[in-house]
Amino acid sequence: MPTEPYIQPMHVLNEAPILCIVGPTGAGKTHLAMSLAEHAKSIGLTIELISMDSALVYRGLDIGSAKPTKAEQDAFIHHLIDIIDPTEVYSAARFANDAKRLCLEIRERGNVPVVVGGTMLYWRAWAHGLSSLPPANSEIRARLDEEGKSIGWPAMHDKLAKVDPETAARLKPNDSQRVQRALEVFEIIGKPMSVLLADSPSEDGREGSAIPSWIDLISLEPRDRKRLHLNLEKRFDEMLTAEFMNEVKALHANTRLHTDLPAIRSVGYRQAWEFLNGEIDAEQMRYKALVATRQLGKRQLTWLRAIEGRKTFDPFNPEELKAALDYCKSNLKK
């Protein structure tokens, strides 16, 4: 198996910290990044945006992922959008490698890298590195998958609890992907994944809740949760009128795609897939998609609030949103 090229650790760079804009889904991260890129252009700088979103990497997942439009992508340079097919898997480790490489290349061109997105596992991998987990073993994975289909994933979760109770305690019984991976790791190395993770230092030796010195983290965190939920509801309904279902139908027609793939498990797509399979009706699809979106936002906020030293702004407060943009502008002058 080919190895990823070595990427120089980012903390050795003797330059201004890299701006990273994060926040829950629907918080306006893309709008802030675009406004900053427009300002940069007006003062003779070129920003290159690096997407930190696990859905945007997939071709064909456009409307449901709120992917920047063609006009937006033409107006500003974007990276890590439409780079793989939905039949493929894009890992956090691959993102970390790609993002570090891009940051170095962008600065070598004399431009400004800005990372923007809300996939927090990608953030952790990029900012702190990941443990040296063994690569996937297709033979073991296929056998575990067949066993899971035969006895059910709750039963597989019980098996995991016997060999790695710590990992099992943080995973839901029906989280087939992660339960399978934990069992796979145990079979490959002969010890629990939790032990390996505990023994693995981050890239710069810091704890996962700290911000590395080479990153300037801007977090958009709405205080009005009700307004955020209403915005998400409005956005989903607008997606439905923007031919989102036709987009999913085109994906559904591809016999190589299924709900075990990360692309199809993306929020909105999974629920639409269930609707096209006849498992739920249209009303249930909308309800389940909105619930899943809210849960995603809650998980993102929980993760963000554990990060010490982040700079927070409420995107629904005009003064704070302006302050966020002003701060980002000042970052360009460093």
Curated annotation (Swiss-Prot):
Stored Gene3D superfamilies: 1.10.20.140, P-loop containing nucleotide triphosphate hydrolases
GO molecular function annotations of the record: ATP binding; ATP hydrolysis activity; tRNA dimethylallyltransferase activity
EC number(s) from the headed UniProt entry: 2.5.1.75
GO BP terms, alphabetized: tRNA modification
Binding site for ATP: G23, P24, T25, G26, A27, G28, K29, T30
Entry-linked Pfam families: IPPT
Uppermost EC category: transferase
UniProt: substrate binding residues: T25, G26, A27, G28, K29, T30
Key words of the record: ATP-binding, Magnesium, Nucleotide-binding, Transferase, tRNA processing
Positions of region (Interaction with substrate tRNA): 53-56, 177-181
Catalytic activity: adenosine(37) in tRNA + dimethylallyl diphosphate = N(6)-dimethylallyladenosine(37) in tRNA + diphosphate
Disulfide bonds: none
Entry cofactors: Mg(2+)
Site note Interaction with substrate tRNA, residues: T119, R141
HAMAP family per UniProt: IPP_trans
Function as written in the Swiss-Prot or TrEMBL entry: Catalyzes the transfer of a dimethylallyl group onto the adenine at position 37 in tRNAs that read codons beginning with uridine, leading to the formation of N6-(dimethylallyl)adenosine (i(6)A).
Subunit structure: Monomer.
Protein family according to the UniProt entry: Belongs to the IPP transferase family.
Protein name: tRNA dimethylallyltransferase
Top-level taxonomy: Bacteria, Pseudomonadati, Pseudomonadota, Betaproteobacteria, Burkholderiales
